[in-house]
């Protein structure tokens, strides 16, 4: 071995490497934490002068020319927490990406032999490469779940970041252009056509697709702040919402940070980021990797990981660095905020912030905002208003009551404030606390009644009570489907009704707020006769009659409802119990105790179609409605759990329904699916996720329907043995997706498209080749809506252009709510983080927007759905559209779409797919 300063002469150290098998080449990323005595590396370090932050090169002889560069010596104490580079997760991920790159390289060469070739550009020859545009075209043409060019660019960026793809000029950003050339490193892979390699390729593309959005985000961060686009700034802001280091900052600060964040990568473990005593100029957030915190005298103090931050004191004062920060692993990425940028942001935000204090404590924080302002949009002069940032629940409610206006429009900021509060109050202000506060405000007198006339005093009280009634009216309209079973709520409403009945002005106001009272009012004005019982009622009716449920809640599962619990025994016999939907496992077991052949000591578990068993905790509730697709409940002795086998019905059908589907046109099938989905979607309440005693069975039922549809598509295609019929069925499913999109049923549209992109279906190359060019072109156009890049930006833009009624892509909406909840603290300095509530309300309000015109037909069959149930003979009359070719009755089709039978075991689908096309 030879040691040298970079660029200088070498000198010999120790015996040759080939004579010391104990050493070998260290893992990429630097020296191990402990160097054994007597090894060659130990002797090298003993003879080398080791000043801080000096780099060396170790050049190995008797091998092909290579060296390890950038080795740094840092005095670290030996610790059990030292990272073992040889088994690091990062290296394992890199290996998977390299393997995926080789598989993709092999498949591209087999499919497009002329893709990789010599290129000549501007009088220069580039050997064995392809252009960025051709590479993206090739990946899209493979049909492996990549639906858009931006998604393919993300995959290529992942390969480029990990070294599985190289730019001929070593640029770090992948560009989808003809004049940018890339090559796969290493020798050309040998062609192979085994089924195992094909499955590995599908898994590899799934891995690359999963990491693609992160790679695109990294590209946006690497750009200089002044070159970032509006979309990139929004993407960075959304990423900041999920970083715990900035969770305490307001959204205004986060938006400003998105414009000044700098990306700082470091490749080698052991690199000193800064040393104790250095001048602090930046704040660091760990985006990837980990660091060790070392101080003089104490050595290793702690280890920081992804999401942690350090150096923030440097932004507050000019104190020197209190510790030394050393990279703990390779390839660490940091988000850096320079002091001058952060101080400017904080100064600007503080200038817009107003704090209200009571008894020496802050109880309300307001921020002056400009309407229309954003991270990349300048504020509009003269359109400033104050919004609530945080506060105590009581002060937020008090401000809301003061800000409400009787003549406000639906788009007024005050109305949005009211909606935000009502949709989220259960998170920070339970209903009992809200009732108490409202009754207190109803009775409260002005602070200084002598300051005005008696008429002004009376007007003030009346106006405030009117605001309370408006708020309660909106609250009742939102929560009315759940209030009949809430004795506390009904008691509060009765108390308020008694108080209102004593004031004629308030009674008249309340009478005009409710449709039932408006009808009575029209009758009393001469439009009809009113019964004496109606005239005798002085107390306003807050809730609709329980016998006349709201249209949106018809058929919804409520807290007190009983649902069937189908419980299997090990011998596959089934026992059905009817229990409350929110019954706990303990209550289910107690009900089973009254049945024969049941012994104490048995447990309740759920089993899926693959035979996987999951135990259920005694306190778990709603297990019947929360079962996944093809899951069943089993009661079994603990020692027999591992012997359980799925019920035969869980395995799915063995024969397809292609003959039946041939009798129904794609348009009419889409109409029936949309009718059924709309019924399920309309039963979901906007706020059921946030209420403690409200079941989520309706939401779970709708989500299970999504999974059912995508596996239904894959099941029917895999169970169609005739190639011609299978191609015809594939064509129908593509047209079905197009009609679902046209009918604005985006949830089922995504489900059908996901089913078509299932690996068991996408591999059926001969079936896809049978499709006409026009149909394949239609499928490619539909795939663009599935593009997940930039946080599903294509879908979100398309959704904003649709007028209601719409059935949105529900999994994405739930993901948004989950990310908002987990990425933001509910309490900030012991105050309610109302910014978080505002974001959650905005996401949940999408449900209301999509259903705001629920009476409009979504499909050609919408107006005839009721007749299907009422009169089976009448339903035989054709209800198809003019262009429909259906010969099957709508009633039988309706029954079919409600009870789809599917195979959800991916291994079984893959097996069937290989039998169709080996």
Swiss-Prot record:
Entry keyword annotation includes Phosphoprotein: yes
Q: What is its main location?
A: cytoplasm
Q: Would the keyword Lipid metabolism be found if you checked this record's keyword annotation?
A: no
Query: Locate the N-terminal Ras-GEF domain: which residues?
Result: 384-521
Q: Which residue ranges are recorded for the region named Disordered?
A: 369-388
Name a GO molecular-function annotation. Answer: cAMP binding
Cellular component GO terms held in the UniProt record: cortical actin cytoskeleton; filopodium; lamellipodium; microvillus; plasma membrane
Which intervals hold domain Ras-GEF? 665-884
Where is each DEP domain found?
110-186
Localization in the cell: Cytoplasm; Membrane
* PROSITE patterns, per database record: CNMP_BINDING_3 (PS50042), DEP (PS50186), RASGEF (PS00720), RASGEF_CAT (PS50009), RASGEF_NTER (PS50212)
Q: Which CDD domains match?
A: CAP_ED (cd00038), DEP_Epac (cd04437), RasGEF (cd00155), REM (cd06224)
Q: How does it assemble?
A: Interacts with PDE3B and PIK3R6; form a signaling complex that regulates phosphatidylinositol 3-kinase gamma in angiogenesis.
Q: What does this protein do?
A: Guanine nucleotide exchange factor (GEF) for RAP1A and RAP2A small GTPases that is activated by binding cAMP. Through simultaneous binding of PDE3B to RAPGEF3 and PIK3R6 is assembled in a signaling complex in which it activates the PI3K gamma complex and which is involved in angiogenesis. Plays a role in the modulation of the cAMP-induced dynamic control of endothelial barrier function through a pathway that is independent on Rho-mediated signaling. Required for the actin rearrangement at cell-cell junctions, such as stress fibers and junctional actin.
Record's protein name: Rap guanine nucleotide exchange factor 3
């Amino acid at each position: 071995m030879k040691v040298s300063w970079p660029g200088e002469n070498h000198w010999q150290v120790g015996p040759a490497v080939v004579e010391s098998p104990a050493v070998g080449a260290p893992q990429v990323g630097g020296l191990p934490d402990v160097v054994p005595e007597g090894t060659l590396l130990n002797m090298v370090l003993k003879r080398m002068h080791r000043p801080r932050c000096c780099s060396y090169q170790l050049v190995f002889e008797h091998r092909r020319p290579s060296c390890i560069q950038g080795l740094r010596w840092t005095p670290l104490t030996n610790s059990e927490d030292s990272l073992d580079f040889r088994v690091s997760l990062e290296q394992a991920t890199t290996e998977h990406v390299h393997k995926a790159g080789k598989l993709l390289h092999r498949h591209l060469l087999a499919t497009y032999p002329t893709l990789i070739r010599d290129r000549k550009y501007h009088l220069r020859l580039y050997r064995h490469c392809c252009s960025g545009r051709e590479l993206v075209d090739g990946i899209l043409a493979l049909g492996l779940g990549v639906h858009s060019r931006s998604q393919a660019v993300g995959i290529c960026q992942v390969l480029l970041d990990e070294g599985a793809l190289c730019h001929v000029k070593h640029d770090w950003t992948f560009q989808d252009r003809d004049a940018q050339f890339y090559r796969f490193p290493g020798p050309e892979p040998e062609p192979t056509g085994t089924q195992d390699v094909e499955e590995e390729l599908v898994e590899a593309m799934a891995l690359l697709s999963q990491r693609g959005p992160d790679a695109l985000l990294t590209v946006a961060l690497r750009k200089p702040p002044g070159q970032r686009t509006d979309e990139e700034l929004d993407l960075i802001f959304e990423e900041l919402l999920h970083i715990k280091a900035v969770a305490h900052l307001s959204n205004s600060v986060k938006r400003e940070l998105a414009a000044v964040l700098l990306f700082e990568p470091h490749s080698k473990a052991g690199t000193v980021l800064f040393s104790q005593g250095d001048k602090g100029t930046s704040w660091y957030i760990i985006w990837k990797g980990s660091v060790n915190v070392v101080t003089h005298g104490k050595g290793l103090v702690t280890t920081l990981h992804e999401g942690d931050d350090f150096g923030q004191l440097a932004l507050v004062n000019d104190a020197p660095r209190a510790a030394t920060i050393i990279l703990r692993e390779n390839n660490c990425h940091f988000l850096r905020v320079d002091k001058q940028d952060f101080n400017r942001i904080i100064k600007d935000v503080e200038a817009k912030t107003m704090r209200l204090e009571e008894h020496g404590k802050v109880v309300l924080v307001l921020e002056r905002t400009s309407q229309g302002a954003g991270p990349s949009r300048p504020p509009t002069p003269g359109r400033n208003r104050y919004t609530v940032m945080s506060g105590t629940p009581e002060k937020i409610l008090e401000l809301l009551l003061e800000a409400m206006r009787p003549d406000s429009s639906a788009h007024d900021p005050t109305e949005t404030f009211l909606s935000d509060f009502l949709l989220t109050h259960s998170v920070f202000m339970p209903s009992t606390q809200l009732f108490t506060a409202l009754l207190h405000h109803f009775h409260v007198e002005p602070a200084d009644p002598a300051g005005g006339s008696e008429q002004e005093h009376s007007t003030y009280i009346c106006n405030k009570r009117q605001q309370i009634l408006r708020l309660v009216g909106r609250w009742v309209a939102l929560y009315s489907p759940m209030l009949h079973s809430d004795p506390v709520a009904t008691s509060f409403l009765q108390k308020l009704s008694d108080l209102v009945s004593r004031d004629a002005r308030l009674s008249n106001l309340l009478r005009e707020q409710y449709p039932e009272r408006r009808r009575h009012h029209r009758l009393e004005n001469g439009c009809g006769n009113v019964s004496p019982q109606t005239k005798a009622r002085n107390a306003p009716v807050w809730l609709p009659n329980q016998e006349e449920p709201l249209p949106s809640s018809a058929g919804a599962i409520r807290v007190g409802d009983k649902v069937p619990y189908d419980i299997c025994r090990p011998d596959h016999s089934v026992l059905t119990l009817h229990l409350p939907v929110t019954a706990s496992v303990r209550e289910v077991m107690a009900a089973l105790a009254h049945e024969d052949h049941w012994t104490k000591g048995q447990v309740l578990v759920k089993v899926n179609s693959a035979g996987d068993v999951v135990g259920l905790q005694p306190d778990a509730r709603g297990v019947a409605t929360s079962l996944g697709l093809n899951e069943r409940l089993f009661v079994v002795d603990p020692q027999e759990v591992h012997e359980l086998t799925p019920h035969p019905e869980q395995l799915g059908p063995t024969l397809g329904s292609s003959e039946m589907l041939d009798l129904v046109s794609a348009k009419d099938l889409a109409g029936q699916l949309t009718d059924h989905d709309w019924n399920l979607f309309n039963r979901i309440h906007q706020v059921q996720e946030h209420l403690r005693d409200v079941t989520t069975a309706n939401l779970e039922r709708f989500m299970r329907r999504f999974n059912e549809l995508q596996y239904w598509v894959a099941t029917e295609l895999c169970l169609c043995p005739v190639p011609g019929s299978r191609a015809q069925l594939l064509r129908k499913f593509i047209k079905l997706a197009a009609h679902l999109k046209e009918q604005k049923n985006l949830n089922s549209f995504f489900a059908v498209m996901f089913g078509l992109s299932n690996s068991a279906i996408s591999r059926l190359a001969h079936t896809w080749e049978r499709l006409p060019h026009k149909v394949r072109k239609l499928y490619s156009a539909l795939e663009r809506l599935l593009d997940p890049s930039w946080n599903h930006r294509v879908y979100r833009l398309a959704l904003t252009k649709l007028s209601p009624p719409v059935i949105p892509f529900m999994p994405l909406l739930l993901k948004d709510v989950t990310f908002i909840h987990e990425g933001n603290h509910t309490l900030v300095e012991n105050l309610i983080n109302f910014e978080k509530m505002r974001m959650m309300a905005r996401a949940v309000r999408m449900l209301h927007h999509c259903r705001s015109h629920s009476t409009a037909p979504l499909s050609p069959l919408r107006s005839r759905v009721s007749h299907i149930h009422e009169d089976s003979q009448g339903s035989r009359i054709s209800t198809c559209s003019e262009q429909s070719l259906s010969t099957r009755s709508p009633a039988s089709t309706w029954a079919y779409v409600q009870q789809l039978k599917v195979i959800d075991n991916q291994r079984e689908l893959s097996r069937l797919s290989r039998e169709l096309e080996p």
